[in-house]
Regions:
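Alpha/beta-hydrolase active-site loop
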Residues: 100-103, 110, 127-146
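N-terminal cap/lid subdomain of alpha/beta-hydrolase-fold enzymes
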Residues: 28-126, 417
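Alpha/beta-hydrolase fold nucleophile elbow
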Residues: 149-162
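Active-site-adjacent alpha-helix of alpha/beta-hydrolase-fold enzymes
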Residues: 405-428
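Alpha/beta-hydrolase fold catalytic core
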Residues: 251-406
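Catalytic histidine-centered segment of alpha/beta-hydrolase-like enzymes
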Residues: 435-446
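A catalytic-pocket lid/entrance helix-loop region that shapes and gates access to the active site
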Residues: 74-78, 175-273
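Glycine-rich nucleophile elbow surrounding the catalytic serine of serine-hydrolase chemistry
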Residues: 159-172
């Protein structure tokens, strides 16, 4: 279908292609039908002059709808400027902050998400795992580039959340398997090393990784003591970083060997940076867990805070509950408005006809197969480093939300500072920060800033 959108005051004419690309075995037997939506700017005859970006979300089990209708595509879900949903009926508007003026885009729904399905549902589990997912999405990218004659185009990947795990490994996979060298990888709310965010006995790392985001959250809700509360967000986060990588990390490592005086000192400092009480920090042995923190910070106000975006709050319905019962930043209305809009958009504007339900976020992919990393944490950082070393021109842009308690900023910074990227290549990594959460682009201020940052990065 043919369309037009105005971006930065310029009319952009484009072609939208929505459909399935069939993955096959070498003998031609069908393996899966992968659904995608592609946008190609009209008037460009030489593909070498026009970038091509492949986009996907995470989960595992998520379709590509969030990046598609939230930030990148030529149409976006209309929301309040603060990122909250409007009442139904939900609707789309032209996205004047779309990236279509910078790059053609292909939104991929991995097998079992969106309208993508395995050829034989009994074999769908063959696609539901870390390695299987990289292989199938990689095969889609290779096939699309070949079928649509885009091998000479500058090529990029953009993933969000688990999609950053996929994108990091995929960059290495595309190079090693197909000789496809990318120009860039964009990681939105990154998780490359799962040890940084899995709260488990014997793993003290996440407590330090989450502390700066705890501090940002407490600052936002005015739960910090003075004079810290009067300082800027960036200054508060930096003080929390310094404490987390110094005294706090040392205290966590010493464990039960800490003296009573040191415990009291660290308790006071953790309290001062998190907004929690002395007694609560003491009860946690200096280790507040994310799901408890969300329930505890504003308990006296009767509020639970969001994990995906800690600016959001909701009522605590079980006052004695130790853990958050639900995430107010992942409210059903957000999923509902995106689900409504993608179904309406595909059928009415892109003329897609199917009897299949569009799986926005499905549990059908679980249990996800991590058998490649039994008895260890999944860590794709070495694969991204390998891609960068093999391809010294590969650039990486990491977008972070200050209020993201799902993939906290310091965990990402820690991961990149422990990747052993050669000094000559470190300039290829760009970090940007936004005053919002996991899907930072839902906040209009961040949506606008992301587009400005994208214009600089794609230059």
């Amino acid at each position: 279908t043919q369309h037009a959108v105005t971006i930065d005051g310029k009319r952009i004419e484009y072609e939208a292609t929505a459909g399935h690309l069939t993955l096959t075995k070498e003998d031609g037997a069908e393996r899966a039908r992968v659904f995608f939506v592609a946008y190609t700017r009209k008037g460009t005859s030489d593909p070498a002059t026009r970038p091509l970006t492949f986009s996907f979300n995470g989960g595992p089990g998520s379709s590509s709808v969030w990046l598609h209708l939230g930030v990148l595509g030529p149409r976006r879900v209309l929301m309040n400027d603060d990122g909250t949903t409007l009442p139904p009926p939900y609707r789309l508007v032209d996205n004047e902050y779309s990236w279509l003026d910078l790059t053609d885009m292909v939104f991929i729904d991995p097998v079992s998400t969106g309208y993508s399905r395995a050829a034989d549902e009994k074999n769908a589990k063959d696609f539901h795992g870390y390695r299987q997912d990289i292989e199938s999405v990689g095969e889609f990218v290779r096939r699309y580039v070949s079928d649509y004659r885009r091998w000479s185009s500058p090529k990029y990947l953009i993933g969000e959340s688990y999609g950053t795990t996929r994108a990091s490994a995929l960059a290495d996979h595309l190079q090693s398997q197909f000789g496809m060298y990318l120009n860039g990888v964009i990681l939105v709310s990154a998780v490359l090393n799962f040890q940084t965010l899995v709260f488990a006995e014997g793993n003290d790392l996440p407590y330090a990784m989450f502390l700066p985001t705890y501090a940002a959250t407490a600052w936002y809700h005015k739960a910090l003591p003075e004079p810290l509360q009067s300082q800027s967000l960036a200054d508060v986060v930096q003080q929390a970083r310094t404490f987390a990588e110094g005294e706090y990390a040392t205290a966590l490592m010493k464990g039960d060997a800490l003296s009573a005086a040191t415990i009291a000192d660290i308790t006071t400092k953790v309290k001062g940076l998190t907004g929690l009480s002395d007694s609560y920090v003491t009860a946690t042995r200096l280790r507040p867990v994310i799901y408890r923190y969300c329930q505890e910070l504003l308990r006296t106000r009767g509020l639970v805070i969001g994990r995906f975006d800690s600016r959001y709050t909701g009522p605590i319905t079980e006052p004695l509950s130790e853990y958050m019962e639900r995430d107010p930043s992942h409210h059903p209305t957000i999923a509902g408005c995106f689900s409504t809009c993608i179904n309406d958009y595909l059928s009415r504007e892109l003329d897609v006809r199917t009897t299949l339900p569009y799986e926005v976020l499905t549990g059908r992919v679980h249990p996800w197969d991590y058998s490649n990393v039994q008895n260890e944490y999944l860590n794709v950082a070495p694969r991204l480093r390998n891609a960068m070393v093999t391809n010294p021109d590969l650039r990486v842009w990491v977008a972070n939300g200050y209020y993201d308690l799902a993939t906290p900023i310091y965990g990402t910074e820690y991961t990149f500072s422990h990747m052993a990227i050669p000094p000559s290549l470190r300039k290829n990594v760009t970090m940007t920060y936004y005053p919002a959460g996991h899907m930072m682009y839902l906040l209009k201020e961040s949506l606008i800033q992301m587009k400005a940052d994208a214009k600089q990065w794609f230059k």
